[in-house]
C-alpha cells in the first residue's frame, strides 16, 4: 500500500526560534524542557509563533484473538464494556479530556461484540476482533492495510477541520501482548525486555503470557518486514494508530505519543518512514515493562513519568497543558528589549 509523504522538518527556522526563546525575560535556559518543546512546536508548525488548535485524542478500540490464550487478567468482553464507558463519559480519558478542553473521538476498530450505533462512536470496524496469533496470523494483509487506511482517514478529517495537535489512545484486552511481539520482532530485543504485566497479571499469569508469546514468535519466524509483522501480531487498533501517525506527520500536525501500545504502533510507522518521529512529542514513560526500552530505541525523553499503565490516551491528555504552556510563553512572554529589562552581564 502507499503512504502519505512526510516532509522532514526545515531547520532554517531554528535560529529565529532559538533567538526568540533566548530573548524572553528569563535567564537562558531557565524554562528547561519547555524551551526545547517550544522550539519543536515552532519547527513542526513552521512558524516562530506557533498556535495550537483543536487538540484532539482519538481512542481506537479493538479485540485480540490472543486473549483466548489467557494472556490478560481481564476477559475480552471488557473491551466492549469500556467502549460503553467511554461513550458514557466515565473513563479516565473522558475526565482528563474534559478537564483540559481536548476533543475526544471513540473509534470501533474491531471490537469482538458489534456495538450498537451511538452518538460519539465512529464505526471503522474491520472484523469482530483479530484471530489468535498464537495459532495463526492475527490479520490478513488486506485487513491490516484497511485498518491503516481507516486510521489515516480519521486523522485527515480532523486536519481538514483545523486540528493541528493530536494524540492517539487505545482500548483492547490483550493488546500489551500484541505490542510486546511487535516490539520484539522489530527491535530484536529479548522478549523479557518487551513483556510486562499488562492489566495486572500475577507471577503465574506473567509466566503463561511469556510462554504463549515465545511460542507465537517461533511459529511466525518468517514475519520480518514491518507490514508482515503488523499483520501477524498486531491489532486493528494498533494498525489504525500506525496509519494515523503517518497521516498526522504528513499533515504537519503535532503528535502526542501516549503509552506502550501507542509507542509500539509508532514503531511500525517509524519503520515505514523514519521522518514520522520529528513530529512526535513523547508524553510519558509508562509503568509497563518494555516502554522505557522502546522509548530508548527512539532516543526519546518523555515529558512525564507518572507510572501510568492505563492507555486510552491518558498520558497524552495529561501532557497537553505543557504543550499549551510552551506555546504560550513563546507567544506571550515579554522580551528583554520590549520590557526594558537588562540582560545578563557579559
Swiss-Prot record:
Taxonomically, which superkingdom?
Bacteria
Q: What Pfam families does the record tag this protein with?
A: DBI_PRT
Q: Which Gene3D superfamilies match?
A: 1.10.1610.10, 3.40.50.10210
CDD domains from the xrefs?
DMB-PRT_CobT
Could you tell me the EC number(s) of this protein? 2.4.2.21
One BP annotation, GO: cobalamin biosynthetic process
Q: Does the keyword Mitochondrion apply?
A: no
Q: Which reaction does it catalyse?
A: 5,6-dimethylbenzimidazole + nicotinate beta-D-ribonucleotide = alpha-ribazole 5'-phosphate + nicotinate + H(+)
Sorted alphabetically, which keywords does the UniProt record give? Cobalamin biosynthesis, Glycosyltransferase, Transferase
Catalytic site: 312
The residues forming the signal peptide are none
Q: Does the keyword Transferase apply?
A: yes
Which pathway does it serve? Nucleoside biosynthesis; alpha-ribazole biosynthesis; alpha-ribazole from 5,6-dimethylbenzimidazole: step 1/2
Tell me one GO molecular function of this protein. nicotinate-nucleotide-dimethylbenzimidazole phosphoribosyltransferase activity
Free-text function comment from the UniProt entry: Catalyzes the synthesis of alpha-ribazole-5'-phosphate from nicotinate mononucleotide (NAMN) and 5,6-dimethylbenzimidazole (DMB).
Entry's PANTHER family?
NICOTINATE-NUCLEOTIDE--DIMETHYLBENZIMIDAZOLE PHOSPHORIBOSYLTRANSFERASE
Record family assignment:
Belongs to the CobT family.
Protein name, per record: Nicotinate-nucleotide--dimethylbenzimidazole phosphoribosyltransferase
Q: What is the lineage of its organism?
A: Bacteria, Pseudomonadati, Pseudomonadota, Betaproteobacteria, Burkholderiales
